Design a protein with these regions (language model features):
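Residue-level signal for glycine
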Residues: 86-87
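C-terminal partner/receptor-binding element of secreted or periplasmic proteins
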Residues: 94-124
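Short, non-transmembrane alpha-helical segments in secretory-pathway proteins
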Residues: 27-51
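C-terminal motif of bacterial Sec signal peptides marking the signal peptidase cleavage site
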Residues: 14-17
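Exposed beta-strand-loop-beta-strand "reactive/processing" segments of non-cytosolic proteins
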Residues: 55-74, 78
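Sec-dependent signal peptide recognition
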Residues: 2-8
Length: 124
């Protein structure tokens, strides 16, 4: 019986220490080197009611630079891609046609290293 309790306690300790932040707490997905202006945009979104669908931010490498894609706050809006200085590069998707603003038609094919930076996990 002591061995069973010891194994159980060890298993609980292992599971507790292996908790995954990306599953349990999406807020912790942000890397430490996120640009201040991108963080400010995320903080701004957090200060208003939850979007429908909830906001998300992904980083990509596009044309040899790290860029950030912000989801739109509602239907038929552009999904905006910005650089590390928060300069708008383009909107590769969204809008009435779903094809974006046409300024980066190669984004879907050439952007690499998609990484979820933040997803709004608040409930409506």
């Amino acid at each position: 019986m002591k061995k069973v309790m010891l194994v159980f306690a060890f298993g609980v300790a292992v599971l507790w220490s292996c908790k995954s932040n990306s599953i349990d707490n999406p807020e912790n997905l942000q890397p430490l080197n996120i640009p201040a202006c991108v963080q400010a945009k995320i903080d701004s979104i957090k200060s208003i009611p939850v979007w429908n669908p909830p906001a998300s931010v992904y980083s990509y490498v596009y044309k040899n630079q790290t860029v950030y894609s912000f989801s739109a706050d509602c239907c038929d809006q552009f999904n905006v891609v910005i650089d590390a200085n928060c300069k708008v590069i383009c909107s590769p998707s969204g809008g009435i046609t779903g094809n974006g603003d046409g300024r980066c038609p190669d984004f879907q094919k050439t952007a690499t290293n998609e990484t979820l930076i933040w997803k709004d996990s608040r409930k409506k």
